[in-house]
């Protein structure tokens, strides 16, 4: 039986972030049950991850019109919502509970296919939410790694392979990705954000992914 996240995280600051994430996720889904969580936190909470992730990333075409309701509901839970900023397609805010803060990013234009999976709360309970399939999450992470070469994006791809249900839909993408794979710019960071188990090396992940894609 898996321990609750708050029992596995080693840093108090990470525990506080995890609890704040839970409050924000619950607030978002109380207002828009079609919102889609993606990115590192979605992988951590919805795909049995062991990599700490801080920010919250959503797709939601409704949340822009619900900004006032979001702020009101957040305040009722003791949260401080800094003023929303919009860049056209994206909506940004920083949210705090007085102890810690995190960034919220919402893509308010893009419509995506989603699936329902349990989101694991820090206390061990769960909440059914919408997120991306493992296959679509991998495609996003391939783009992210190709753009910035952060080790966390490569690790997320590596981790998600075990959840792929339609191998044919991403096998070619993985193979092509590996043929042009440059080393990460921050490999040493991985061991600081993996909070359980061994953090694999870049070479280990590359070999294992190539074997998977055969």
Residue map of PLM features:
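Structured mid-to-C-terminal alpha-helical surface segments
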Residues: 1-35, 46-56, 61-214
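Glycine-rich beta-strand-to-loop/alpha-helix junction loops that act as flexible
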Residues: 37-42
């Amino acid at each position: 039986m898996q321990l609750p996240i708050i029992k596995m995280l080693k840093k108090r600051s990470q525990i506080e972030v995890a609890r704040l994430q839970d409050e924000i996720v619950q607030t978002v889904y109380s207002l828009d049950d079609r919102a889609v969580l993606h990115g590192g936190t979605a992988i951590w909470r919805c795909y049995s991850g062991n990599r700490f992730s801080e920010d919250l990333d959503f797709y939601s075409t409704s949340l822009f019109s619900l900004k006032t309701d979001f702020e009101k509901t957040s305040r009722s839970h003791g949260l401080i919502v800094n003023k929303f900023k919009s860049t056209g397609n994206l909506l940004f805010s920083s949210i705090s509970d007085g102890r810690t803060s995190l960034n919220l990013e919402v893509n308010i234009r893009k419509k995506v296919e989603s699936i329902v999976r349990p989101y694991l709360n820090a206390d061990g309970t769960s909440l059914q939410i919408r997120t991306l399939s493992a296959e679509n999450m991998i495609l996003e992470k391939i783009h992210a790694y190709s753009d910035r070469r952060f080790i966390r994006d490569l690790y997320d791809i590596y981790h998600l392979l075990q959840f792929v249900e339609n191998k044919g839909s991403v096998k070619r993408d993985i193979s092509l990705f590996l043929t042009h794979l440059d080393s990460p710019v921050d490999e040493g960071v991985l061991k600081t954000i993996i909070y359980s188990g061994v953090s694999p090396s870049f070479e280990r992940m590359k070999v294992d992914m190539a074997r998977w894609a055969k």
